[in-house]
């Protein structure tokens, strides 16, 4: 369910930062800073270091993203 203008990639959470921000290493080796999407925050989905996540990136700034899914 990615938006048309967003790039969706998978990665692994490497580090937890303050204010529900995370450092995520993508499949291609790039490291981005990502925050939790509103629906995940609303449903109290916990994200820990080492979790596999799906990240939405915008073409305008590829260093920041939004975590939209956590794999089980």
UniProtKB/Swiss-Prot annotation:
Task: Give the matching Pfam families.
Answer: eIF-1a
Q: Does the keyword RNA-binding apply?
A: yes
- PROSITE patterns recorded: S1_IF1_TYPE
- Which residues belong to any copy of the S1-like domain? 1-72
Q: Which UniProt keywords apply?
A: Cytoplasm, Initiation factor, Protein biosynthesis, RNA-binding, rRNA-binding
Q: Does the keyword Methyltransferase apply?
A: no
Q: Which GO terms describe its molecular function?
A: ribosome binding; rRNA binding; translation initiation factor activity
InterPro entries registered for this protein in UniProt? NA-bd_OB-fold, RNA-binding_domain_S1_IF1, S1_domain, TIF_IF1
List where in the cell it is found: Cytoplasm
What is a single cellular component term in the Gene Ontology annotation? cytosol
Q: Which PANTHER family match?
A: TRANSLATION INITIATION FACTOR IF-1, CHLOROPLASTIC (PTHR33370:SF1)
Summary of subunit composition and partner proteins: Component of the 30S ribosomal translation pre-initiation complex which assembles on the 30S ribosome in the order IF-2 and IF-3, IF-1 and N-formylmethionyl-tRNA(fMet); mRNA recruitment can occur at any time during PIC assembly.
What does this protein's UniProt record list under function?
A: One of the essential components for the initiation of protein synthesis. Stabilizes the binding of IF-2 and IF-3 on the 30S subunit to which N-formylmethionyl-tRNA(fMet) subsequently binds. Helps modulate mRNA selection, yielding the 30S pre-initiation complex (PIC). Upon addition of the 50S ribosomal subunit IF-1, IF-2 and IF-3 are released leaving the mature 70S translation initiation complex.
Family as reported in the entry's similarity comment: Belongs to the IF-1 family.
- Kindly provide the name given to this protein in its UniProt entry: Translation initiation factor IF-1
